[in-house]
Amino acid sequence: MIYFREQAKCTRKYVIPYIEQVVSITPRFRVLEIGCGEGGNIEPFLDLGCQCVGIDIDVVQLENAKKYLSSHPGFERVTFIANDINKVSSEEIGCFDLIILRDVIEHIPNQEQFMHRLKNFMHDDTIVFFGFPVWCNPFGGHHQICCNKVLSHMPWLHLLPNALYKKVLQWGGETQGKIQALLEIKETGISLHRFERIIHKEQYKVLQHTHYLINPNYEIKFGLRPCVLPKWLQIPYLSDFYTTAMYYLIKK
């Protein structure tokens, strides 16, 4: 429930205002969240009267989402689907006015293929929001989830070679399941340059993008005030090492 509340608060306070710099979200909107987890990001859109669909491969998290949102007055306006987005067709769920991927793209394998298929769920005016940690940032490998307090606070740990990274995690007493999850993130983590190369190749139009020195979500988790990275520090490749989050709005 804690993570659900963190998601809901950050989306309500930062993500929705960011999107509304480009488009006003109205009750007529159909909203798709890919990788919805426990549904915290969906709650603020239900508050706005939107029709929502949440897709995730984690059945347990989806059951939590249903439980947490069951008392919401707009619960009948949300549908949850337990599946891989790559196995879902637009014939099944249709197209959407807004698609949300928050802290998700860095977990998806074959990102080029995914970004191509994403268009199947878009009409000409669909806007897609991406929020993701750049791979090379101090905690881009999500190793802050480690139980070992030293490892969870060690910046850039995930940039070690795979074999050494695995050994360090084992030394730190992490479970085999957590080690495997962190190694999978290492396989799919995405750099800013690579993300931009993919959207350029797929001919998406970038409506807005923002580099964050301090991720907006860090305010909810750690009490740190969000901070946009100054333009003069947005140095290609180098800024990947200190940009903790990117926000993007794109369309076809």
What are these regions (language model features)?
Residues 1-94, 98, 115, 214-216, ...:
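Conserved N-terminal segment of class I S-adenosyl-L-methionine
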Residues 29, 125-126:
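Surface-exposed loop/turn positions
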Residues 112-117, 127-248:
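S-adenosyl-L-methionine-dependent methyltransferase catalytic module, highlighting the catalytic core
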Residues 101-102:
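A short beta-strand submotif of the Rossmann-like class I SAM-dependent methyltransferase core
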Residues 43, 64, 110-111, 139-141:
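Short glycine-/acidic-enriched loop or helix-start segments at secondary-structure transitions
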Residues 87, 106, 137:
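Active-site micro-motifs of SAM-dependent methyltransferase domains
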Residues 108-109, 122-123:
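Helix-to-beta-strand junctions that scaffold the AdoMet/dcAdoMet cofactor pocket
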Residues 250-252:
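Active-site beta-strand termini and strand-to-loop segments that position acidic
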